[in-house]
A protein has these predicted regions:
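Bacterial Sec-dependent N-terminal signal peptides
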Residues: 1-27
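Functional surface patches built around histidine and acidic residues
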Residues: 23-147
Length: 147
């Protein structure tokens, strides 16, 4: 049996840890895009114009979702003007064993079941930013901000 050098062993271990994080990051982006598409499809269905995706708020949305997920606590930003938004909706969703398409359906359905969230989605805003965070237990934390 050939000996494997210690450097190759360490490199193999590092790669094993890096690959899942890249997959999770990619899936988060896919979930964000799918939620955006679902919300826009809903708005068109009710006769509203589509939202424009606001890239400048995505980082703060992702950061907020990450913070909620790490602390396991749903909370709104106290001063939305500090993050450049006019409205915000947040959610915790359990995703175990679900695809990102199924999960995005759930996210929209839950928001539409809440009169205050539905009012924001159907409201006067024309820009939207979405940031999600998925915990190791597959809990999905969502922050959506509107301008």
């Amino acid at each position: 049996m050939k000996k494997v050098s210690p450097i190759l062993r360490i490199l193999g271990i590092v790669l094993c840890f890096l690959i899942p994080f890249n997959i999770i990051s990619q899936d988060n982006s896919n979930i964000e895009k799918e939620i955006f598409n679902k919300i826009n499809n809903y708005r068109v269905k009710i006769g509203k114009s589509k939202f424009i995706f606001n890239d400048s708020l995505v980082k703060s949305c992702r950061s907020h979702s990450n913070s909620m997920g790490i602390n396991y606590k749903l909370e709104h930003v106290k001063n939305l003007s500090e993050v450049g938004a006019n409205a915000e909706i947040i959610q915790l969703n359990y995703t175990t064993g679900r695809t990102f398409i199924e999960t995005s359906d759930d996210v929209l359905d839950i928001f539409l079941d809440s009169p205050s969230h539905k009012k924001i989605i159907e409201g006067i805003y024309n820009q939207i930013s979405i940031g999600v965070f998925v915990t190791k237990d597959e809990d999905l934390w969502v922050t959506i901000r509107f301008k």
